[in-house]
Amino acid sequence: MLTFPRIDPVAITLGPLQFRWYGLMYLFGFLSGWWLGRRRAAQPGSRWTGEMVDDMVTYVILGVVLGGRIGYILFYDLAYYLSNPTQIFSIWNGGMSFHGGLLGVVFAMWLLGRRNGLGFMDVSDFVAPLIPPGLFFGRIGNFINGELWGKHTTLPWGMVFPDGGPFPRHPSQLYECALEGVILFLALWVFSSRKRPTGHVSGLFALLYGVFRFTVEFVREPDVQLGYLAFGWLTMGQVLCLPLIMLGLWLLRPGGDKGTKAA
């Protein structure tokens, strides 16, 4: 059994101001996406400029924060927030939905494409490889908060989480860090380094993320307010991943978009 590192969720205190690790992880995620986007925009043949990447990050931040929070409220705990509306704005305590954030980013990419005369899939293919670092840092934030832990386990790397009872649990946040953060990033970055048919980079992102998240959900404790939705094992996270997997397969289908462009 591994010892859970008890890290103060407050990273920096400046007088009355407190900066939490959870919020800093989002900052690190946005900065990494900005840096990677700038690097890719500077490559020969890119249709993107540094200024477009700057605009993209602004749009994405709004999409992630607003979409992620609204998605969590609607998908996971609507009754609680209807009873406690003042908690809607307490995002520093956690409570963000990837799927809601993704919908927010999709809308942001549509707006960005319209502004710059780019097709939606052109924007999506450029942005997709920049997302996994944000997922990596986000799951680190979940781990520091001691939230979203997994089911009980006897495996040697099981951990006793502060609010997870006396028995070791899967550190499912770290599983997602590795799969959705590291492996997904490497796969997308390498895949998109060559010219691909329009939509294929986005399709690979949707497919791999959906498969990785669907798999980890089997060892992740379901949200207590929802539990299992069906069959004694199906979670809300898995339900929300099914459309992503199907979308990814459709975008990657043989004979799809014939246009070949650099991401």
Swiss-Prot record:
Disulfide bonds: none annotated. Pathway: Protein modification; lipoprotein biosynthesis (diacylglyceryl transfer). PROSITE patterns: LGT. Coiled coil: none annotated. One of its GO terms (molecular function) is phosphatidylglycerol-prolipoprotein diacylglyceryl transferase activity. Signal peptide: none annotated. Keywords: Cell inner membrane, Cell membrane, Membrane, Transferase, Transmembrane, Transmembrane helix. Its EC number is 2.5.1.145. A 1,2-diacyl-sn-glycero-3-phospho-(1'-sn-glycerol) binds at R139. The chain crosses the membrane at residues 10-30, 56-76, 91-111, 117-137, 171-191, 199-219, 231-251. It is a multi-pass membrane protein. GO terms for biological process: lipoprotein biosynthetic process. Pfam families: LGT (PF01790). GO terms for cellular component: plasma membrane. It comes from the Bacteria. It is found in: Cell inner membrane. Catalyzes the transfer of the diacylglyceryl group from phosphatidylglycerol to the sulfhydryl group of the N-terminal cysteine of a prolipoprotein, the first step in the formation of mature lipoproteins. PANTHER family: PHOSPHATIDYLGLYCEROL--PROLIPOPROTEIN DIACYLGLYCERYL TRANSFERASE, PROLIPOPROTEIN DIACYLGLYCERYL TRANSFERASE. Belongs to the Lgt family. This is Phosphatidylglycerol--prolipoprotein diacylglyceryl transferase. The gene is lgt.
